[in-house]
Structure formats: C-alpha cells, structure tokens
C-alpha cells in the first residue's frame, strides 16, 4: 500500500538536535526506534486500532523538486509516512501528534501538492490527504473490496470507543467489569457490529452494536439481534462517564434481567460468507452509499 509522505523543513537552518530528537521519541508512548546505515526510523502503532506512522531521518534529502521551493526553508532530511487508507478519526489524532512534533523542533511541513513549504495547518493537510486518498480509492478497486464505508458519525463513535478501551479497562479493573472489543464481520455488502461476552458477567456495551454473541456455561455461542431489544434493555444500562455517547455498562444488580431480555431476542444465523475484519478497515464517506 502507498503512504502519504510529509517532509519537514526549518527556516534558515538545517540543525535539529539529534539527542533531543531521540529523547522526544523515547518519551512518546508505543514508539519503537530502529536504525541502520541508511536511516533512523521511529515507528508508532496505535495499541487498539492498529494503525501507525513512521518518522524517518535520512542522510540526504528525499524531497522531489526541492529546487523549486523557497530558499528561506531548508530540508532537515526528516519525513513522516502515514497510511493512505486511514479513517478520519485516527488521521486527526496523528495530525495532533505531528503538530506537537513541528512545534517542538520549529519545523514546517511540505507535501508536493503544496505550493511551497507552509506553516502547520490542520485544514490544508486534511484537504490534501483526503484528495490523495480519494484518488487512491478510485484506482484500487480490488484492494477496496476488503474495506467498509460507514457513516462518519457512526464511525467516530466506534473509533472513539476503541481509542478509550485501555482507559476503560483500567477504570473498571477493580470492579470486574468486562470491556469488550468490537467483533466486526463483513460479507462484502453488510457489516455486523458485534461484541462477544460471557453469560451473566458485568460488561460495558459499546456504541453502535447490532449483535451480541453470548457464550453460555456449556461453551455454546449464540448471536442475538441486539437491535430488536435495545429499547427494552435501555433502562437497565448505566452511562459510562467520560467517554463517547452511547457507551454503557451492565452492572451486577441488573445483569440477570439484562441477560434474560437479550436471550429472548431473535437468534441470528451468521452466513459463512461473513469474514472477520479489523476496525482499521473502516473508512468514512458521506453520502447515500454509506452503511449505517
């Protein structure tokens, strides 16, 4: 897969303190450092969404057509590569990280679609990224068969929940509340947004799910249509503080009643055409073709 590359420049200087740079990335969570005779690489991967980026320091410039750019800005031989197929939620998180990096070392970003080296601007970077992404999607139909396009608001809630999972697990660890990940199943047309839980446990219920897999004591597993009973169980759910709207928890005092209602919902038959996908295969697109 292609990447979206941003180069970094500095005004009237090429100097970047390497020790400060190494310490900067050493203090960044989930970043690994690699180096050899060709480059130094700082690799980040989101711990629950599994999308990442890579900063690279090279011995010489890799900027195309550098001589057409303003001489007031000098290439510091650092660039970042981002996945070209990335949802807007994670892209915005990565932009915030890039903004911090630019401010820390007084850098200015550049992409070949820019007129010149520019100050960091969220809107400009977002417009150019999504322009490049759109062209990539149009050209790679076969690759896109494994991706799902969701309504932007639905996708935002799902990614915000996944982004919060580790904090939720820490918040609930002392009271034995299970924090499930999404189980996503896709057959090329329909997306099933599910969770799998054990019968009777206290659990968080993420936003936007339509199916609950319940594993019974005999280890059998049933898929229940959550949408059919969502309104019935709503009074039993407690809103989880400090996270995205639609995130609730089933507490012990109501768990028996909750599971009785869920197990009266229609049982879904999941066709073998459905395959498991990860949330990183979800993209947002406005319009009538979106899956809600």
Name each region found by the language model:
Residues 1-50, 148-150, 154-161, 289-292:
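Short, extreme N-terminal segment that most often corresponds to the first beta-strand
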Residues 15-20, 123, 225, 258, ...:
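Secondary-structure junction/capping motif
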Residues 27-31, 104, 134, 168-171, ...:
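Surface-exposed polar/charged interaction patches
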Residues 93-100, 104-119, 186, 193-221, ...:
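Amphipathic alpha-helical protein-interaction segments
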Residues 37-41, 71-169:
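Internal, hydrophobic cores of structured domains that mediate oligomerization or house catalytic pockets
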Residues 227-292:
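Extended, charged low-complexity segments
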Residues 123-228:
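Aromatic/basic-lined ligand-recognition segments
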Residues 23-88, 214, 219-235, 239:
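Short, intrinsically disordered low-complexity segments
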